[in-house]
């Protein structure tokens, strides 16, 4: 499966109305790609936290889910008075990977456990 490019995400958010609002100014493209590949393969994820259409937790999962046409549960979250909405067209999609190899492995293990599948299947999906 091909990776989603920065240009493809920017074109998508520019051409589409995104239901939920971001509260982040930057997101990590490699993280989105790993989640996207897993979602396309049917790997389940926990819900994202939302309050008043603002994403409190789960920005990478949300964008990946839209691109993969994957339904994600929405659970109540909490925002503060300082939390601001960020237009998706203003979000920077960074190509540098924010996760260390150790964190990627830990997340893969969590996903394998959550889905009750061998970690080798998760690792294979990401190749």
Predicted regions span which residues?
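Basic- and aromatic-enriched surface patches that contact anionic nucleotides/nucleic acids
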Residues: 47-127
């Amino acid at each position: 499966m091909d990776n989603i490019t920065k240009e493809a995400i920017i074109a998508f958010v520019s051409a589409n109305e995104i239901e939920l609002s971001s509260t982040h100014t930057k997101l990590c493209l490699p993280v989105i790609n790993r989640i996207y590949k897993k979602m396309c393969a049917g790997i389940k994820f926990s819900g994202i936290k939302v309050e008043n259409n603002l994403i409190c937790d789960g920005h990478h999962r949300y964008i990946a889910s839209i691109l993969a046409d994957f339904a994600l549960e929405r659970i109540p979250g909490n925002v503060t008075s300082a939390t601001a909405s960020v237009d998706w067209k203003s979000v920077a999609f960074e190509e540098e990977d924010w996760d260390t190899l150790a964190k990627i492995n830990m997340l893969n293990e969590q996903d394998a456990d959550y889905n009750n599948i061998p970690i080798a299947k998760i690792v294979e999906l990401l190749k």
